[in-house]
From Swiss-Prot:
Native source organism of the sequence: Sodalis glossinidius (strain morsitans)
Coiled-coil stretches noted in the UniProt entry, renumbered to this chain: none
InterPro entries associated with the record: Ribosomal_bL34, Ribosomal_bL34_CS
Chain spans, region Disordered: 28-47
Top-rank taxon, per record: Bacteria
UniProtKB keywords: Ribonucleoprotein, Ribosomal protein
Family: Belongs to the bacterial ribosomal protein bL34 family.
GO BP, sorted A to Z: translation
Biased composition (Basic residues): 31-40
Keyword GTP-binding on entry: no
Any one Gene Ontology cellular component term annotated for this protein: ribonucleoprotein complex
Record protein name field: Large ribosomal subunit protein bL34
Taxonomic lineage from the root: Bacteria, Pseudomonadati, Pseudomonadota, Gammaproteobacteria, Enterobacterales
Length: 47
């Protein structure tokens, strides 16, 4: 049986990246929460 997780950096960044988060109001809320919590990496794309 084929595995369900077929990694793609492009798809990953388009759905979970910084610019994807900034594009919507809720995404910006996610970033604000992570900033408030003190996360060193806000999104997976900011390494």
């Amino acid at each position: 049986m084929k595995r369900t997780f077929q990694p793609s950096v492009l798809k990953r960044n388009r759905s979970h990246g910084f610019r994807a988060r900034m594009a919507t109001k809720n995404g910006r809320q996610v970033l604000a929460r992570r900033r408030a919590k003190g996360r060193t990496r806000l999104t997976l794309s900011s390494k």
